UniProtKB/Swiss-Prot annotation:
Keywords per UniProt: Flavoprotein, FMN, NAD, NADP, Nucleotide-binding, Oxidoreductase
Domain of life: Bacteria
Protein name: NAD(P)H dehydrogenase (quinone)
Annotated positions binding FMN: 10-15, 78-80, 113-119, 134
Length: 199
């Protein structure tokens, strides 16, 4: 049984919802799944004034524990076309894991969100993949076998690089059914590949 970590950062709860959908998918594929989040860097008074969702039940992860898992699925919103600084800061503390090769051969995958359709979802995922590759991880995306990412009948996130959701500038749009299904599919897909690698 593969051990899968869904590691996320969510300011307003959109990525949190996606993270639990990813976890559901991974569990459905037989994985042992843990959901954790990275620490908030914004001062609490600023976060409260900005209406951040601070009541998230997932425990805080530490960089060293990444080595305990067979697959790590990373989720964070885009900030100006790249990953949110909270997630970047967390991974910038993994030099010891890199030096000792603790993540080599593990599966890595990424999902994201943005305020608009063209707000940097693909650039965020593609910009984070080199971090996984530098750690020697095997990168897995969201294949077109998930047909939900095809078509133009509705506004939706998702690409072969990973699941994603669109939030609107005011955060009023929640992940749609098809976006959550994409997240579940990605979680299951990663878990199945990780299980083959650890068999």
């Amino acid at each position: 049984m593969a051990k899968v970590l869904v590691l996320y950062y969510s300011a307003y709860g959109h990525i949190e919802k996606m993270a639990y959908a990813v976890a559901e998918g991974a569990k459905s594929a037989g994985a042992e799944v843990t959901v954790k989040r990275v620490p908030e860097l914004v001062p609490e008074e600023v976060a409260k004034a900005s209406y951040f969702k601070l009541d998230q039940e997932a425990p805080i992860a530490t960089p060293d524990e990444l080595a305990e898992y067979d697959a790590i699925i990373v989720g964070a919103g885009t900030r100006f076309g790249t990953v949110a600084s909270q997630m970047r800061n967390f991974w910038d503390q993994t030099g010891g894991l890199w030096f000792s090769g603790k993540l080599v051969g593990k599966v890595g995958s990424v999902f994201t969100s943005s305020a608009t359709q063209h707000g940097g979802q693909e650039s965020t995922i593609l910009g984070f993949i080199p971090t996984l590759l530098h750690h020697g991880m095997a990168v897995v995306g969201l294949p077109y076998a998930f047909a939900g990412q095809m078509g133009t009948e509705e506004v939706k996130g998702g690409s072969p690089y990973g699941a994603s959701t669109i939030t609107n500038g005011d955060g009023s749009r929640q992940p749609s059914e098809i976006e959550l299904e994409a997240a579940k599919y990605q979680g299951a897909h990663v878990a199945k590949i990780a299980a083959k690698l650890v068999a």
